[in-house]
Amino acid sequence: MDDQDPGGISPLQQMVASGAGAVVTSLFMTPLDVVKVRLQSQRPTVASELTTPSRFWSLSYTKSPSTLQSPGKCLLYCNGVLEPLYLCPNGTRCATWFQDPTRFTGTLDAFVKIVRHEGTRTLWSGLPATLVMTVPATAIYFTAYDQLKAFLCGQSLTSDLYAPMVAGALARMGTVTVVSPLELVRTKLQAQHVSYRELAACVQAAVAQGGWRSLWLGWGPTALRDVPFSALYWFNYELVKSQLNGPRQKEQTSVGISFVAGGISGMVAATLTLPFDVVKTQRQMSLGAVEAMRVKPPRVDSTWLLLRRIQAESGTRGLFAGFLPRIIKAAPSCAIMISTYEFGKSFFHRLNQEQPLGH
C-alpha cells in the first residue's frame, strides 16, 4: 500500500471499504449468529437452582426483600454478534420466549422454533447495537491488517508466506484489546436495564469494584478464539487466493475468487477455534448473571479450566456445541466480508487512478 502510488488505497479508504463489508455481512449473517449462540447456551439439563454462577448458562436468581422477592432468570438472549443478556423477572419482561421455553435439537429446529415462538424479527434483534460495535471494530481490524502486512513485507521482517499470519494475529489482538472493555460494559448495561446515557457511571462502578483490569475480564477467551482464528484465516486466505489466481497478479483478483477463498478459510479457522468460542459464550453468560444478581463476583475460572469443565460435563461434543451453525455462518460471512472489502478496495483503486490522491 504505497501512499506515493496514485492508484494506491489510503487507510481511510480501507476503513470505508471494510466498514461497508461489516454492514452487509451483519445484515445477512445475524440470524445464524443468533442460532449459534442459542445452541451454545443450552446445557444437557436445565439448572433450576443457583449454585456456582460460572457453571451454568441459564441461572435462576431471587431478588432481595427490598425488591419484592420476585424470582427470575438470567438468560443469554442472543441478538447476533453481541450476544447480550436479558433479565426475566417472573417471565414478564421476556414475554413469549420466556413463558414458553424451548429446547433446540439442531440448527433447523432452532430456526423454526425461534420464528414460531418469538417472531421473525427476533433473528435480527439488536442489529443496530451490533453495527455500532462491529463496524468500527471491523474497520480498525482490516485496515490494521493491510497496513501491518505491507509493513512486514516491505521491511522484510518475515516471508511473504507467513506475513498474513503474523499481521492477522497482531491486528486482531489490537482490535480485541480495544473492543473487549466495550463488550463487557455493554453486557452490564443489558443486565441492569439501564440506558447508554449511564455508560460513564457503569464504567466507574466496574472500575471501583474490580479496578481497571475488570474491564478486560473477557479478554482471555476472546483473544484465544479470535487471534488464532485471524492468523489461520489470513494465512489460508492468501494461500488459497494465490492458488486460484494462478499466474495472474494479486491485483487482478476477482470478487468471485475472494468469495471462494474467504469461505474456505473461514470454515477451516472456525472449526479449529470453536472450543474457545464456546468458552467465550459461557464466560459472558456467567459475568452477566453475576451482575444481574448484584452479588460479589466469584473467582474467574481460567479458560483451560472452563474447557476441562465443559468436557467433563458434556463430553467432547460440549466443546463443539453450535458446530453446524458456526460453520454455516463462518463460511458465508467470511466470504461476504472479504469479497465486499476487496470490491471496495478495487473501487477506490480505480477511483484513485482516475483522480490521483492529493488532487
From Swiss-Prot:
Q: Which domain of life is it from?
A: Eukaryota
Indicate where this protein is primarily found. Answer: mitochondrion
Provide the transmembrane region boundaries.
15-35, 122-142, 165-185, 215-235, 256-276, 318-338
- Those parts of the protein on the Mitochondrial matrix side are 36-121, 186-214, 277-317
Membrane topology recorded in Swiss-Prot or TrEMBL: Multi-pass membrane protein
Q: Which residues lie on this side of the membrane: Mitochondrial intermembrane?
A: 1-14, 143-164, 236-255, 339-359
Q: Name one Pfam family in it.
A: Mito_carr
Give a short account of its post-translational modification.
Answer: Cleaved and degraded by AFG3L2; degradation by AFG3L2 is regulated by the ability of SLC25A39 to bind iron-sulfur. In absence of mitochondrial glutathione, SLC25A39 binds iron-sulfur, preventing cleavage and degradation by AFG3L2. The presence of mitochondrial glutathione prevents iron-sulfur-binding to SLC25A39, promoting cleavage and degradation by AFG3L2.
Residue stretches of each Solcar repeat: 9-151, 159-243, 253-347
Q: Where does [2Fe-2S] cluster bind?
A: C74, C78, C88, C94
Query: What GO CC terms are in its UniProt record?
Result: mitochondrial inner membrane; mitochondrion
Q: How is its activity regulated?
A: The activity of SLC25A39 is regulated by levels of mitochondrial glutathione via its ability to bind [2Fe-2S] iron-sulfur cluster. Upon physiological levels of mitochondrial glutathione, glutathione prevents iron-sulfur-binding to SLC25A39 promoting cleavage and degradation by AFG3L2. Upon depletion of mitochondrial glutathione, SLC25A39 binds iron-sulfur, preventing cleavage and degradation by AFG3L2.
Question: Which BP terms from GO are recorded?
Answer: cellular response to iron ion; glutathione import into mitochondrion; heme biosynthetic process; import into the mitochondrion
Enumerate the catalysed reactions. glutathione(in) = glutathione(out)
InterPro entries named among the record's database cross-references: Mitochondrial_sb/sol_carrier, Mt_carrier_dom_sf, Mtm1-like
Keywords on this record?
Answer: 2Fe-2S, Heme biosynthesis, Iron, Iron-sulfur, Membrane, Metal-binding, Mitochondrion, Mitochondrion inner membrane, Repeat, Transmembrane, Transmembrane helix, Transport
| Location(s), subcellular | Mitochondrion inner membrane
Single GO molecular-function term?
Answer: metal ion binding
What's this chain's function?
Mitochondrial transporter required for glutathione import into mitochondria. Glutathione, which plays key roles in oxidative metabolism, is produced exclusively in the cytosol and is imported in many organelles. Mitochondrial glutathione is required for the activity and stability of proteins containing iron-sulfur clusters, as well as erythropoiesis.
The family annotation for this protein states: Belongs to the mitochondrial carrier (TC 2.A.29) family.
Q: What is this protein called?
A: Mitochondrial glutathione transporter SLC25A39
Organism whose genome encodes this protein: Rattus norvegicus
Q: Which gene specifies this protein's sequence?
A: Slc25a39
